[in-house]
Amino acid sequence: MEPVKAPAPLVIISSSPYIHCGSTISAAMRDVLLSLLPALAAAVYFFGWSALSVILTCCLSAVICEALCQKLMQRPITVGDGSALLTGLLLAFCLPPELSLGLAAFGSFCAVVIGKQVFGGLGSNIFNPAHLGRAILLASFPAQMTTWTMPWNTAAAEAVTKTTPYTDAVSSATPLAALRLAESAWQRGLNVDLPSLSALFWGNVGGSLGETCVPALLLGGIYLLWRGHIDWRIPAGYIGTVVVITAIYGWLREYPTWFAIYHLLSGGLIIGAFFMATDWVTSPITKKGRLIYALGLGILTALIRLRGGYVEGVCYSILIMNMVTPLIDRYVTNVPFGGGARHE
């Protein structure tokens, strides 16, 4: 007697999502990489070939570290999707232009292995990998991570060295550091020359190699908004909160009227708001949650910049709010159609 064969299933059961836009990880990563090309060109233009060597080292190290880590963990090797390349590029944009290539490679290792693969790979990490790599570098090598190179045009350097001794100009002549020194001078009734707002806007100032040129970053951010890869609520809420808090702080202390604009154009606020805080994995999933997340980012960044011991607060504020994201997603959720309020 022949065995009875079971009929073919008429219904295939699978998990959601059942309908999607057709976009893939590789396509999304290509769009983000494309949006960063203007900032990359600006970095090489202002800081020269040393900036390009740091960028190439970070990108190559990130790809190699991810491939080796996935091989050792017996996971599918996914370096072709571009996520490791993007992590390396974003990390490079947060580093000083003259950082040694060995430290750049170490930062990529920390970003990819500790920041992503240890948690299970892409989609499972709780921290932004690039900023985690930067934070580890800053904690481990503070002197090297706070040594800045002026752009090829010395006009901005001359403006900053008027506020600091010449021998300290390289290590402390970022706009935010100069602004912190200027605050002390203003409280004593002294006037201080700072880099102009136009120099801040165009990027002809000292700083991390990918954060100084505002037009290039805005161009990339607008492209991501147009392509639908990021939600406007995060960059708008983040930047708006920082501007409001610094404006009120400057008004209460009778600082110049452009004090808040200086904070807007200085440091890593623009790149952080458009490219770091909007990371799909580490940011909230709901619209209301993203607004709360952006508000928290702005408050933390402003507090660290205005009252903290370190003049820049973007990196740490994003890492802190990354930890808060699961809590936001837990209590700020969309109610399914037909469902009622959640009771616990």
What are these model-predicted stretches?
Residues 129-217:
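Long hydrophobic alpha-helical segments that form multi-pass transmembrane helix bundles
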Residues 48-61, 98-107, 200-214, 257-269:
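Structural signature of hydrophobic alpha-helical transmembrane segments
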Residues 126-131, 260-267, 290, 308-321:
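Loop-to-transmembrane alpha-helix initiation sites
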Residues 31-39, 54-66, 83-88, 92, ...:
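Alpha-helical transmembrane segments in multi-pass membrane proteins
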Residues 84, 89-162:
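Membrane-interface helix-loop-helix junctions at boundaries between adjacent transmembrane segments
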Residues 235-238, 244-287:
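A beta-strand-loop signature enriched in Asp, Gly, Thr, and Trp
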Residues 1-66, 70, 341-344:
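N-terminal signal-anchor module of multipass membrane proteins
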Residues 64-76, 112-123, 219-227, 274-283:
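C-terminal ends of transmembrane helices
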